[in-house]
Every structure is written in C-alpha cells, then in structure tokens.
Regions:
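Sec-dependent N-terminal signal peptides
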Residues: 18-27
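Secretory/extracellular carbohydrate-interaction modules
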Residues: 67-140
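Short, aromatic/His-centered strand-loop micro-motif at the edge of beta-sheets
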Residues: 141-167
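Flexible glycan-contacting loops in extracellular carbohydrate-active proteins
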Residues: 189-216
C-alpha cells in the first residue's frame, strides 16, 4: 500500500481487510470498544443481509437515556447517513414504537436527535401516522413538551415498517436540520430552530425505551 494522504484515515475492517475512506465512519468497521454505551446492550450481528450493530435498550430506562456514542467523533455541520431498523423488543410495553435514530452534537447529557417510530408508519390511526418522525433536544425538549407547545411542528409522517431497513439521512447546517428517508429528494422533516443552537459535539446511535434497534452503513460527512 502506498502513502496515505493526510486528509484520509484508515480503519481496520473486522473481516481482516483494510478500508480506505475519506472523512467517513463506517459503522461495521467500529469495534465495541469504540462505542461508549449508555443504558444499552450492544453486539455485532448479521441482520437482513447487513453487517450491523444491534442495540437493546435496558429495561426501565427513561426516555432519552439509551444510546451508544461514537468515541472520538466531533460533529458540527454536515451529513449523517445510516441504515436503521427498529422494532419493539420481546418484552416491550404496549406503547413501544421501535424508536430509533441518531443523536448529534452531544455535550455531556445534552444533545439533539431525530428519530423514527416505525410502528406508526402504517398504523390504521392517522394521528399515529402523523407522528412517524420526531425531533427533540435532550433533556429539556422531549416529544411531549414540543407536542404541547408547538403541535405538529417537530414531527411528521413518513412510510415506515418495523424491523425493516430504512435509509436515514440528516443534513445539518447551523440551527437547521433536514431528515431524508429511503433516498427521497424532499425531506420528510424540516427543523429550522435546533434548540441547542449552532453548537458542536459528539454523535450517537440512539434507541428509545423497549427498542430492539439495528444500525449499518453509517457515514458521517462534514
């Protein structure tokens, strides 16, 4: 192998191959040691044809407390992409929705996040469908507060199925974020006033209470 350009980094793939990338972070090249776990159990698995990381939220964990931080990742503006699949776990409560998404700009216990409710995507209740996608800012701005103070502003509909791979992409610039699902040209959720402002911080894989979540194909582009 020749000289490696300074603006690139090499990660060691778990199948004993070297992968050369430009400013990205492929999830399946991460080891469990590179994930800082918060109230989740994590494992490497094969799921629906993909090398993936599975996260299981710990029982009786408060909303917003279960995630896995990518160690050493510092994010400000850019794009975060992943394949995600979420579904209620075996012992989940009846109101579990398979909550799954990405948290960004983590600073201590504060972060922004956009997540999916896969069981809502094809529900027979239109109100539930309208709540398929959600933005929040932990810990002060959870879904309940945002729904009370600004109904329908921070959530929307998108077609989802529990346990099925969904292409997830968020584009973040300053105090704005856009979520694109399954290669759509138009965003399914637009947030023009990120509650933590034009900040920067870490990135985490996020699951909500009762979720069995899978993550693959992660790419972070500044």
């Amino acid at each position: 192998m020749g000289a490696i350009p300074k603006n690139r980094r090499v990660v060691y793939h778990h199948t004993m191959r070297y992968v050369l990338i430009l400013m990205t972070a492929p999830l399946w090249a991460q080891t469990m040691d590179q994930l800082e776990l918060h109230q989740v159990a994590a494992s490497k698995v094969q799921y629906e044809g993909k090398d993936a990381v599975r996260l299981l939220a710990r029982p009786n964990v408060a909303n917003g407390e279960s995630y896995a931080i990518l160690k050493g990742e510092r994010f400000h503006n850019g794009t975060i992409e992943a394949s995600v699949a979420g579904k209620p776990g075996a012992n989940a409560a009846p109101d579990a929705r398979g909550f799954i998404g990405i948290a960004f700009r983590l600073q201590g216990n504060r972060y922004e996040y956009i997540y999916l409710r896969p069981t809502n995507g094809r529900a027979d209740d239109q109100v539930r469908r309208n709540h398929s996608v959600q933005y929040g800012a932990h810990p002060a701005y959870d879904f309940d507060r945002l729904r009370r103070e600004s109904p329908e502003k921070y959530e929307s509909y998108v077609d989802l199925q529990p346990g099925v791979w969904t292409q997830y992409k968020i584009v973040i610039e300053g105090t704005k974020a856009r979520l694109y699902v399954n290669g759509a040209v138009q965003p399914c959720l637009i947030v023009n006033d990120l509650k933590l402002g034009d900040s920067q911080g870490g990135v985490a894989l996020w699951v909500g209470p009762g979720t069995e979540g899978y993550f693959a194909d992660l790419k972070i582009t500044p």
